[in-house]
Amino acid sequence: MRISKAKLSNKLSSLPLSCLALGLALSFGTAKAGDFPTAKVNTTGLAVTDTTVTVGILHSATGTMAISETGSIQAEKLAIAQINAVGGVLGRKIEVIQEDGASDWPTFAEKSKKLLENDKVAAVMDCWTSASRKAVLPVFEKDNGLLFYPTFYEGLEQSKNVFYTGQEATQQILAGLDWITKEKKAKTFYLIGSDYIWPRTSMKIARKHIEEHLKGKVVGEEYVALGDTQFGSVINKIKLKKPDIIYAAVVGGSNVAWFKQLNAAGLNAKKQTMLTISVTEDEVLGIGGENLEGFYSAMKYFQSLKNPNNDAFVPEFKKAYGGNAVIGDVTQAAYLGPWLWKAGVERAGSFDVDKVVAALPGYELTTAPEGYVKVDPNHHLLSKLRIGKWRKDGQADVVYESELIAPDPFPKGYQ
């Protein structure tokens, strides 16, 4: 489905410029299309005209992952509307073709192929799960497409065709485990995740870190099918094992059942400590703050984060999507994707993928809602880890913030 600037919504296009939008507008100035002839800035047949450039948005608008991915769609559309409001990219307005991955990995691959081969989009804001990313990666590498991936993930990957705006394992998993172990003097851990590549690989990394570096013990490890809502058996095992920490990577709609059933079974934060690496404000909308009050999440961004960038960003997001709208870690990382793409294109002076890829590493963004980030040569971002303690109102108090952590997607000893 093609979405023109007008159809992005009058509400979005009339928003005041954010701190991020103003900062980038000042950094790049106002590029005029006449200064960048199409024949020179588009030598590979992308969907670029003298007045427009087309990008793709591909997330799950339906299915079990829609609870998590809707925020990414909203954030990317907001960023694109703001970019258009400051003159677009190389003087061209961005048009969007949006597709629905429908929480189905083959569908993601099929839609990616359509966007790249038929629609000739200049870039795609794509995926949430690692399973969907793994499904589309061969398509992007074959067709030399450009993917901005917003989700925290297991690492152990690096592609010329992907920029990863979420955190990899050493930034989220290892730093989070270090904090919770020290803070709670934890010795025993129970690992639980959804049954696909990200939770399984993440738990493999977590187990190794717990046992070899933290000298702890994993007393249980369980995986549930994506979309599963029956957690009674797992909860009974946890009650029997009595771990110091539940370490969780349950995703999508399963999270709603998981936390509600935990609470109903009496395993609330007063009796059990949990650190999750998969719950953001987006998921809390469905889970209900009362069902995870006092539990912890390890993320680089929380909506409650206090800094001038975020103080400007949150009201604008709510103005676009309503006062009850929330912003989670992946939503904020998704918001960065269009802005980083704009930066790469304008540094390169071209929409050609190879030139954008070469231009973006080293770029420093000081106006992101999360704070300073920098694009590493390995296509990940330098960023901080934060630990949030959930409140009943569905927001989190940030109780820990690390220094900037350099991304290391292939950590020695964890491969």
Task: List each model region and its residues.
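Short, low-complexity disordered leader/linker segments with a strong preference
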Residues: M1-T54, Q415
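Solvent-exposed, acidic/polar segments of extracytosolic/periplasmic ligand-binding ectodomains
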Residues: G34-N42, L46, V53, P361-Q415
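Beta-alpha junction/loop-to-helix N-cap segments that form part of ligand/metal-binding clefts
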Residues: F36-T43, T52-T54, I67-Q74, Q82-L156, ...
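Hydrophobic alpha-helical segments within soluble ligand-binding/sensing domains
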Residues: K40, F108, T165-F189, R200-T201, ...
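An alpha-beta-alpha
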Residues: A61, V162-L226, I245, G322, ...
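Periplasmic-binding protein-like
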Residues: L115-C127, F148-P150, Y190-G193, K242-G252, ...
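Extracellular/periplasmic bilobed ligand-binding domains
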Residues: M203-A298
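Extracellular/periplasmic periplasmic-binding protein-like sensory domains
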Residues: Q261-Y335, E346-F351, Y400-Q415
